[in-house]
Every structure is written in C-alpha cells, then in structure tokens.
Amino acid sequence: MLQDTQTIRHYQKLTDALVEMWNRGYRFDDLRLYLDGYLAALRHTNAIEPYLVHRLEEEATRYIHDRSNFEMPLPQPESGYY
C-alpha cells in the first residue's frame, strides 16, 4: 500500500495513462514498456526514493495484471418502462 503523497500522485498519473493507452488500442506489452520507461525515468531523476520506486513498480504491475481495470463497463438495461 502506498502512503507517500508523491508516490501516490505518480501512481494515479501512471494508472490513468495506462487506461488511456488501453482505450486507444495499445495492448499489455505496450503498457509494460510504458511502465518500464516511466519507472526508469523516476529512477534516473531521483524524483522519489528508490524504495518508493520499487513499491510503485509492485503496485503498478499488480494493476496491469488485474484485467478488470481495463474492462469497459456495460450499461445496465433499464427495466420497468414497458
């Protein structure tokens, strides 16, 4: 569980970008490459502590592997009108 505010902001930006890329037609290999690049940039710039980057990587990988994050919600049919 992420507790550092900067790390949480990075997680939110990252997961929003992953969902947006998925909706544009990118697949899991592309998402993984994006995640790897994002994490490499964080490590290179020392924006957050290395152990926080590792935690962020674990959480983001868990997010990618949960396919329910990328499913489009189906609207519920409205009943009772007929």
Question: Which residues does each predicted region cover?
Answer:
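N-terminal acidic leader/helix
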Residues: 1-36
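Amphipathic alpha-helical segments that form the core helices of the histone-fold
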Residues: 36-43
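Charged low-complexity stretches with an acidic bias
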Residues: 4, 54-82
